[in-house]
């Protein structure tokens, strides 16, 4: 039995959870999310808690897979409950001379030192806001109820100009430490 999977998930006020045909649907003030759950895992909703247990009758190729599924689906359902009740936020920082970001609705325009600007169409579930103050690095603020989708969008934006180790220029998460390298040593033989 998975240690993470054993923990029950408490359902906060204003959130409703339904189970139909191995699909868990969570509705809350921030939105609605659905997740398919493998038949090897049983889902029970009772007394304001969601509990996931391993189905002893389920046959899988590898018995260890059932333990892995137990922890995986518990984490996915927990992320859905937190997402629809509180939401998830991530901040990206653009470090570099002339790096800019602006948004029109759900389209981000990035100026990252290339000969052309980059336009990124975001999914409707992700809300975006850009901040740029004088003498500070521009910020991209992203918010969504779907943690997985938010991570994918942030990763896609970051992939256009990953931070480089010599000067630290690029797109990074706020608070992320970039491992720096020293340049060429002068006169090294």
Curated annotation (Swiss-Prot):
GO BP annotations listed: cytoplasmic translation
Renumbered to this chain, the signal peptide range is none
SUPFAM superfamilies (alphabetical): Ribosomal protein L6
Q: Name the UniProt key words of this record, in alphabetical order.
A: Ribonucleoprotein, Ribosomal protein, RNA-binding, rRNA-binding
Q: Which InterPro entries has this protein been placed in?
A: Ribosomal_uL6-like, Ribosomal_uL6-like_a/b-dom_sf, Ribosomal_uL6_a/b-dom, Ribosomal_uL6_bac-type, Ribosomal_uL6_CS
Instruction: Tell me the superkingdom of the source.
Output: Bacteria
For this UniProt entry, the molecular function terms from Gene Ontology, in alphabetical order, are: rRNA binding; structural constituent of ribosome
What GO CC terms are in its UniProt record?
cytosolic large ribosomal subunit
Instruction: Name the Pfam families on file.
Output: Ribosomal_L6 (PF00347)
Indicate the family of this protein: Belongs to the universal ribosomal protein uL6 family.
Its subunit composition reads: Part of the 50S ribosomal subunit.
Role summary: This protein binds to the 23S rRNA, and is important in its secondary structure. It is located near the subunit interface in the base of the L7/L12 stalk, and near the tRNA binding site of the peptidyltransferase center.
Protein name, entry field: Large ribosomal subunit protein uL6
Query: What's the gene?
Result: rplF
């Amino acid at each position: 039995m998975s240690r993470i999977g054993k923990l029950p998930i408490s359902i906060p006020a204003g959130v409703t959870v339904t189970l139909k045909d191995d699909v868990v649907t969570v509705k809350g003030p921030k939105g609605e999310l659905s997740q398919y759950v493998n038949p090897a895992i049983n889902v029970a909703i009772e007394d304001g808690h969601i509990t996931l247990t391993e189905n002893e009758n389920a046959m899988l190729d590898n018995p260890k897979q059932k333990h892995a599924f137990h922890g995986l689906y518990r984490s996915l359902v927990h992320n859905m409950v937190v997402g629809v009740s509180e939401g998830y936020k991530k901040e990206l920082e653009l470090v570099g001379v002339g790096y800019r970001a602006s948004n029109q609705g759900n389209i981000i325009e990035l100026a990252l030192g290339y000969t052309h600007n980059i336009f990124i169409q975001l999914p409707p579930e992700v809300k975006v806001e850009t901040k740029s103050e004088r003498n500070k690095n521009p910020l991209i603020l992203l918010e969504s109820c779907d943690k997985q989708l938010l991570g994918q969008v942030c990763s896609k934006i970051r992939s256009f100009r990953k931070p480089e180790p010599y000067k630290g220029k690029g797109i990074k998460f706020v608070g992320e430490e970039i491992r720096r390298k020293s340049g060429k040593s002068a006169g090294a033989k």
